[in-house]
Design a protein with these regions (language model features):
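Mobile active-site "lid"/loop adjacent to the S-adenosyl-L-methionine
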Residues: 75-102, 106-109
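Short beta->alpha junction loops/turns
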Residues: 32, 122-123, 180
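Conserved SAM/SAH cofactor-binding pocket of Class I
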Residues: 1-73, 79-87
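Short, well-ordered secondary-structure micro-motifs
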Residues: 65-66, 83, 129-131, 155
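Conserved Class I SAM-dependent methyltransferase catalytic core
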Residues: 98-153
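SAM/dcSAM-binding transferase cores
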Residues: 152-188
């Protein structure tokens, strides 16, 4: 059976999407107890409750019995911005609780042989992650996401493995053409 891990699950949305599209066993971890509790409630209310598990733990300390075939993360990424007085908001939005080097180390430790790691980050933060993961994780897919043809890259969707491979040719995904209801075919 395939096993998947969602790091920094928040409310569990990405884990639920994985469950909807696969028959895998999915574990979702979040350092924030309230987030993990909310994710567990959302999982229990879903048709896939028997394959979803939410755990409140920092991924750096997570020690499961088995490794994962796919690890996904849309992690907190603000590094240089001001912190909020709300500690929970800081945990959800700032990389201080999960530095990219520690994320890369956790992924390498938790990934099964031949497994993949999918990551979503803005461009500057993705470059910071790649620097932190240098020599440990290698990109196999790379998609630059733009909201419209005239706007710059807003996010990068990247997939990594632990085996050195040639760098992939970047793909570009444009979400809309600029008018109302003008989503591109690729985005739909």
């Amino acid at each position: 059976d395939r096993r998947m891990l969602d790091v920094g699950t928040g409310t569990g949305l990405i884990a639920l999407m994985l469950a909807q599209r696969s028959a895998a066993w999915i574990t979702a971890v979040d350092i924030d107890v309230e987030c993990a509790t909310q994710a567990a409630e959302n999982f229990a209310a879903s048709p896939w409750a028997d394959r979803l598990d939410a755990v409140s733990v920092a991924v750096q300390r997570y020690d499961p019995v088995e490794k994962f075939d796919l690890i996904v993360s849309n992690p907190p990424y603000y590094v240089d911005s001001l912190l909020s007085p709300d500690e929970g908001r800081n945990t959800a939005r700032h990389a201080a609780g999960l530095p990219f080097g520690e994320l890369a180390a956790a992924v390498v430790r938790l990934l099964s042989p031949g497994g993949r790691f999918a990551l979503v980050l803005p461009p500057v933060e993705m470059q910071r992650f790649r620097s932190a993961a240098l020599g440990r994780l290698y990109p196999v897919r790379w998609t630059e996401v733009c909201s419209t043809p005239r706007r710059g890259v807003r996010r990068i969707l990247a997939e990594f493995c632990t085996t050195p491979v040639p760098a992939p040719e970047p793909a570009r995904l444009i979400i809309e053409l600029g008018g109302p209801d003008s989503y591109t075919e690729d985005y739909r």
